[in-house]
């Protein structure tokens, strides 16, 4: 028999996928942004929804410099996990009169929801994952995260069963959030203990 050896060298197989990756990025950039208004009752319903998806909730505003600074990382996370049942749900604390400003910011960030994400949203009776919250900060905290103290940005990673896996006020550490998401989704895709 011939011994089995490890292949060594540089893998270039991904080079041939560059045109496909460019198409995917172009589709993301062209995805329309829809912003809906959401009150406390709607947020409570969204938060309590039974789903098979991990959700990253982000409370933010266009007038909040740390929120603006971290947003590209949130978009990156959303794209990274688009095919893995992970949703980015944004909750803007801007005034309702600034809805167009919110939509313009999200469009500039290329934060449109993918077809896969829109399909999941439509299954729950929503048209988007981007919301302008119309209630008070206290109502938002009561509906989303009773431990939220008030400052933004405020980010949660929530398991499909509703358990909060990650809670952070301030600018997120992208790799930390990615690690939390991977720990959760790998429970379903990884090898079973003892095997």
Where are the regions that the model predicts?
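Conserved redox-active cysteine motifs that mediate thiol-disulfide chemistry
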Residues: 59-76
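Residue-level recognition of beta-strand->loop/alpha-helix junctions
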Residues: 92-94, 132, 168
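Short pre-active-site segment immediately N-terminal to redox-active cysteine/selenocysteine motifs
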Residues: 53-55, 59-63, 95, 151
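A short beta-strand-turn-helix
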Residues: 34-55, 78-81
């Amino acid at each position: 028999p011939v011994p089995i050896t490890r292949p060594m060298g540089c893998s270039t197989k991904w080079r041939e996928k560059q045109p496909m990756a460019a198409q995917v990025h172009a589709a993301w950039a062209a995805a329309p942004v829809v912003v809906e208004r959401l009150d406390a009752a709607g947020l409570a319903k969204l938060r309590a929804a039974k789903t098979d998806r991990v959700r990253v909730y982000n409370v933010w505003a266009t007038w909040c410099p740390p929120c603006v600074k971290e947003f590209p990382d949130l978009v990156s996370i959303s794209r990274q996990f688009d095919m893995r049942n992970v949703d980015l749900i944004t909750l803007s604390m801007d005034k309702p009169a600034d809805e167009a400003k919110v939509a313009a910011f999200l469009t500039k960030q290329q934060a449109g929801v993918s077809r896969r994400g829109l399909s999941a949203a439509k299954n729950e009776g929503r048209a988007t994952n981007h919301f302008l919250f119309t209630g008070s900060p206290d109502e938002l905290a009561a509906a989303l995260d009773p431990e939220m103290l008030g400052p933004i940005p405020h980010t949660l990673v929530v398991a499909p069963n509703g358990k909060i896996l990650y809670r952070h006020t301030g600018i997120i550490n992208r790799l930390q959030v990615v690690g939390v998401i991977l720990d959760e989704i790998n429970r379903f895709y990884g090898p079973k203990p003892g095997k």
